[in-house]
Structure formats: C-alpha cells, structure tokens
C-alpha cells in the first residue's frame, strides 16, 4: 500500500499567523526519510493554505512524486500544465467549505473534465479524479480515459468517528449521523463493502485506485485491507500527530498500519 502524505496543513499552520514559518518545503526530506511514497498538495483557488510559490518549489524540489490536487477551472489547469507534477487529481471546490466535501460530479461535468484531462495528458501528467464511491462515477471516470480515481472516504470516516470517538459529544457532532450504534455499525459495514466492490469494478475497467479524506490512525486499517486500493492520501491526521511526535515518527506510525 502506497502512502501519499498531504502536507497542506503545514501551510494551514503558517497561514494562521500570516507569517513565513513553518514552510511546507521543509517537510520534503522528512517525508522521504520516513518512506512516504508521494507528496500530495492542494492548490485551492482561494489560496487559503498552499500558494503558487509553494506548489512551484515543492514540485521542482521534491525527490518524491508530487500529486497536485486542483479544481477544473482553466486557470488552475494552466498552472498545473506549467508546473507539470507527476499527477494531478481533479477535485471539486466550494469557497465556503472547510475541506473538500464530496467527489466530482463526473457525470454532469464531462465537457469541462474532458478539456482539462486532455490538456494535462498532453503534458504527460497522470490524471486522477476525486470521486464519491458510486458505480456511475467509476464508469464515467473510465470513459474519460484517466489513469487513476481516488475515492472520497469522508462518509466512512464520519460514520466511524460518530461510532468510535467522542465526536457525537462535541460541537462538531454530525446531526444526520446521531443514530443508534447498531445503525451506525451497519452503515459502516455497508460503506466498506461498497468501497471494496467499487474498487474491484474500477480495476476491471483498468483504473488504478486511491482513497483518501478523513483517514486517520484509528480508521485506516479497514480501508488499507481492501486489496484493489493501491494508495492512500492522508494529511490532517499525520500533521496533527506530528505536533507531539515529530513528522518523521508520525509518518512511520501511519506506514506501520498499512
């Protein structure tokens, strides 16, 4: 199982004080030393954490492959084509969201996606689509000719958190998941079964499969056991643990679970 370490939250910490430190660039050598397989960054349209210079420096200087997440807006594709990372993962964006809330509406945005994918692949950039776990999204992704899909695991992570953490007792509780434990357990089981079946479906169609969003040290193993998933992209939980253990140990701890 490959691990892509998302270092966005280093930039989040920097932007909390609008200063120059910590610099996400400093994480590159640590990630490599800890045997991460990939660096993942999200250059958002609103530049709320990573900025253009961050993306440029990271892509140019990283010894590990860089997976650049970005929206399908032509201006963002312009940047991706200029920087030429190893891979671009196309993601949906809403300016008001705290984090990416769901997968791309692949079946409803095919014209825009086709143009973005064509431009990226002409620059010999691998393309991945960040999608919800749904059969129609898998099929549409295959039809678009991309190399990868990445399943949005946010629903699985939210159910797990409401079931096995104290999230339900905090102000971050998820109202629609305030359900009996027996119901949540069934939902969690169904979500994992769906991820497994859809990953197998994707592999039959020739797609490589990644997954990410909300994965942490408590919930990751069940997803990592799905054989058809080749890669996990994980960020916030690793950066959060690094506050206490250091980044290298936090990555090693995650690698030990995969």
UniProtKB/Swiss-Prot annotation:
Q: Give the record's keywords alphabetically.
A: Cytoplasm, Pyridoxine biosynthesis, Transferase
Catalytic site: 42, 69, 213
Report the SUPFAM superfamilies cross-referenced here.
Pyridoxine 5'-phosphate synthase
Q: What is its EC number?
A: 2.6.99.2
Keyword Endoplasmic reticulum on entry? no
At the top level of its lineage, which domain of life is listed?
A: Bacteria
The pathway to which it is assigned is: Cofactor biosynthesis; pyridoxine 5'-phosphate biosynthesis; pyridoxine 5'-phosphate from D-erythrose 4-phosphate: step 5/5
Ligand binding (1-deoxy-D-xylulose 5-phosphate): 8-9, 44, 49, 99
Under Pfam families, the record lists: PdxJ
What this protein is called in its record is Pyridoxine 5'-phosphate synthase
> Which species does the entry assign this protein to?
Sulfurovum sp. (strain NBC37-1)
């Amino acid at each position: 199982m490959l691990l892509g370490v998302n270092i966005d939250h280093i930039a989040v910490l920097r932007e909390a004080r609008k200063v120059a430190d910590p610099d996400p660039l400093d994480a590159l050598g640590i990630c490599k030393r800890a045997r991460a397989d990939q660096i993942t960054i999200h250059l958002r349209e609103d530049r709320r954490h990573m900025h253009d210079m961050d993306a440029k420096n990271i892509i140019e200087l990283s010894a590990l492959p860089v997976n650049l997440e970005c929206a399908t807006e032509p201006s963002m594709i312009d940047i991706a084509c200029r920087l030429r990372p190893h891979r671009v993962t196309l993601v949906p964006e809403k300016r008001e969201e705290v984090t990416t809330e769901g997968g791309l509406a692949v079946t409803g945005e095919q014209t825009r996606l086709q143009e973005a994918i064509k431009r990226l692949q002409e620059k010999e950039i691998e393309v991945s689509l960040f999608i919800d776990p749904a059969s129609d999204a898998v099929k549409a992704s295959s039809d678009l000719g991309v190399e990868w899909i990445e399943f949005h695991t946010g629903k699985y992570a939210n159910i797990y958190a409401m079931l096995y953490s104290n999230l339900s007792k905090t102000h971050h509780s998820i109202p629609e998941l305030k359900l009996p434990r027996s119901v949540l357990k069934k939902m969690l089981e169904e979500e994992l079964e769906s991820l497994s079946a859809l990953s197998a479906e994707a592999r039959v169609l020739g797609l490589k499969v990644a997954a990410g969003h909300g994965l942490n040290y408590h919930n990751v193993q069940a997803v990592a056991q799905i054989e058809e998933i080749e890669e996990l992209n994980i960020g916030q939980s690793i950066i959060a643990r690094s506050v206490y253990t250091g980044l290298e140990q936090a990555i090693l701890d995650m690698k030990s679970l995969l």
